[in-house]
Protein backbone atom coordinates (compact mmCIF):
# COMPACT_ATOMS: atom_id res chain seq x y z
CA UNK A 1 0.00 0.00 0.00
CA UNK A 2 1.35 3.40 -0.98
CA UNK A 3 0.50 6.60 0.83
CA UNK A 4 0.83 10.03 -0.75
CA UNK A 5 0.40 13.18 1.31
CA UNK A 6 -1.79 15.91 -0.12
CA UNK A 7 -2.85 18.92 1.89
CA UNK A 8 -3.93 21.67 -0.49
CA UNK A 9 -7.50 21.38 -1.71
CA UNK A 10 -7.69 20.84 -5.46
CA UNK A 11 -3.97 21.34 -5.93
CA UNK A 12 -1.83 18.46 -4.77
CA UNK A 13 -2.23 15.12 -6.48
CA UNK A 14 -2.78 12.08 -4.30
CA UNK A 15 -2.79 8.36 -4.79
CA UNK A 16 -6.08 7.57 -3.03
CA UNK A 17 -4.98 3.95 -2.66
CA UNK A 18 -5.62 2.25 0.66
CA UNK A 19 -5.89 5.51 2.57
CA UNK A 20 -7.13 9.08 2.58
CA UNK A 21 -4.26 11.33 3.62
CA UNK A 22 -5.59 14.66 2.42
CA UNK A 23 -6.31 15.94 5.93
CA UNK A 24 -7.33 19.48 6.81
CA UNK A 25 -10.99 18.67 6.19
CA UNK A 26 -10.29 17.57 2.63
CA UNK A 27 -10.98 14.29 0.88
CA UNK A 28 -9.27 12.53 -2.00
CA UNK A 29 -11.19 11.98 -5.23
CA UNK A 30 -10.13 9.58 -7.97
CA UNK A 31 -9.28 10.83 -11.43
CA UNK A 32 -11.21 9.37 -14.34
CA UNK A 33 -8.21 7.40 -15.58
CA UNK A 34 -6.75 6.57 -12.19
CA UNK A 35 -4.36 9.49 -12.42
CA UNK A 36 -4.46 13.11 -11.36
CA UNK A 37 -6.36 12.37 -8.19
CA UNK A 38 -7.10 15.51 -6.22
CA UNK A 39 -7.83 16.65 -2.71
CA UNK A 40 -11.09 18.55 -2.51
CA UNK A 41 -13.01 20.11 0.34
CA UNK A 42 -15.01 17.47 2.14
CA UNK A 43 -14.89 14.93 4.92
CA UNK A 44 -11.44 13.43 5.20
CA UNK A 45 -9.14 11.76 7.66
CA UNK A 46 -6.45 13.68 9.53
CA UNK A 47 -3.04 13.82 7.90
CA UNK A 48 -0.57 12.28 10.34
CA UNK A 49 2.83 13.73 11.13
CA UNK A 50 4.54 10.36 10.71
CA UNK A 51 4.36 7.42 8.35
CA UNK A 52 4.06 4.60 10.85
CA UNK A 53 1.67 1.70 10.45
CA UNK A 54 -1.68 2.51 12.01
CA UNK A 55 -1.46 6.22 11.26
CA UNK A 56 -3.78 5.95 8.28
CA UNK A 57 -7.44 5.05 8.04
CA UNK A 58 -8.54 2.83 5.21
CA UNK A 59 -10.90 4.21 2.58
CA UNK A 60 -14.25 2.40 2.74
CA UNK A 61 -14.56 -0.14 -0.07
CA UNK A 62 -17.45 1.67 -1.74
CA UNK A 63 -15.07 4.50 -2.62
CA UNK A 64 -12.60 2.19 -4.33
CA UNK A 65 -14.88 1.03 -7.12
UniProtKB/Swiss-Prot annotation:
<feature type="disulfide bond">
    <location>
        <begin position="22"/>
        <end position="39"/>
    </location>
</feature>
<keyword id="KW-0765">Sulfation</keyword>
<feature type="disulfide bond">
    <location>
        <begin position="16"/>
        <end position="28"/>
    </location>
</feature>
<dbReference type="Pfam" id="PF00713">
    <property type="entry name" value="Hirudin"/>
</dbReference>
<dbReference type="InterPro" id="IPR024793">
    <property type="entry name" value="Hirudin"/>
</dbReference>
<feature type="compositionally biased region" description="Acidic residues">
    <location>
        <begin position="55"/>
        <end position="65"/>
    </location>
</feature>
<keyword id="KW-0325">Glycoprotein</keyword>
<feature type="region of interest" description="Disordered">
    <location>
        <begin position="40"/>
        <end position="65"/>
    </location>
</feature>
<feature type="glycosylation site" description="O-linked (GalNAc...) threonine">
    <location>
        <position position="45"/>
    </location>
</feature>
<dbReference type="GO" id="GO:0004867">
    <property type="term" value="F:serine-type endopeptidase inhibitor activity"/>
</dbReference>
<keyword id="KW-0646">Protease inhibitor</keyword>
<dbReference type="GO" id="GO:0005576">
    <property type="term" value="C:extracellular region"/>
</dbReference>
<feature type="region of interest" description="Interaction with fibrinogen-binding exosite of thrombin">
    <location>
        <begin position="55"/>
        <end position="65"/>
    </location>
</feature>
<feature type="region of interest" description="Interaction with thrombin active site">
    <location>
        <begin position="1"/>
        <end position="3"/>
    </location>
</feature>
<comment type="similarity">
    <text>Belongs to the protease inhibitor I14 (hirudin) family.</text>
</comment>
<feature type="modified residue" description="Sulfotyrosine">
    <location>
        <position position="63"/>
    </location>
</feature>
<comment type="function">
    <text>Hirudin is a potent thrombin-specific protease inhibitor. It forms a stable non-covalent complex with alpha-thrombin, thereby abolishing its ability to cleave fibrinogen.</text>
</comment>
<dbReference type="InterPro" id="IPR000429">
    <property type="entry name" value="Prot_inh_hirudin"/>
</dbReference>
<keyword id="KW-1015">Disulfide bond</keyword>
<protein>
    <recommendedName>
        <fullName>Hirudin-3B'</fullName>
    </recommendedName>
</protein>
<keyword id="KW-0964">Secreted</keyword>
<feature type="disulfide bond">
    <location>
        <begin position="6"/>
        <end position="14"/>
    </location>
</feature>
<keyword id="KW-0722">Serine protease inhibitor</keyword>
<dbReference type="InterPro" id="IPR011061">
    <property type="entry name" value="Hirudin/antistatin"/>
</dbReference>
Amino acid sequence: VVYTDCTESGQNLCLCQGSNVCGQGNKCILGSNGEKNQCVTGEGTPKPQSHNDGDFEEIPEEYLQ
